[in-house]
């Protein structure tokens, strides 16, 4: 039997992480910085390498397959609306991506390095050092990625691009950045001042907007949720 409280907390976490994900893809022109300079050298990438695109809030991951091709997981609402590969294989727009996150539908797809990077620099195999895990052979990594190509369920917390890459590279799907996000939120929740602050904001909204269902319910539910989870 599912725990309603845990489901509610999970939903809140996913919505907060979604905001960061939206900011991740809100700027940049594929493959170049503002001065038009290329931020990476494709010839230095090896088949099976993990490519990382660091941003302010999140890092996007992919597996290099060779020949300027990168396999990566991308949310895309169009996958739930049409089977036309001519449309779904086009570069995923921000609108398609955001709705895909909400709809929890994605695909592990192949794009060019330029489209994958989306205007940012690329780090190579940085996870090997940060996770201190032994990587599989590069060819096995690439083959694992190729076998997973296609539509897949999506979750910012439980099945994202980092889970895909770590499974291919190390054999175990993990997402340190999602775990870190949850830990930070947990710290905030455990701080009882968060309960007081949310209660004050709730009362302020009732005072300013009046006693209605859309002000009263959040004013009661959010402090209660933080108190129970703390």
UniProtKB/Swiss-Prot annotation:
Example of a GO MF term: phosphatidylcholine-retinol O-acyltransferase activity
Chief subcellular location: endoplasmic reticulum
Gene Ontology, cellular component aspect: endoplasmic reticulum; endoplasmic reticulum membrane; multivesicular body; perinuclear region of cytoplasm; rough endoplasmic reticulum
Pathway: Cofactor metabolism; retinol metabolism
One Pfam family cited in the UniProt record for this chain: LRAT
Transmembrane segments: 195-215
Catalytic residue list: 60, 72, 161 (acyl-thioester intermediate)
Protein family: Belongs to the H-rev107 family.
Protein name (database record): Lecithin retinol acyltransferase
Native source organism of the sequence: Bos taurus
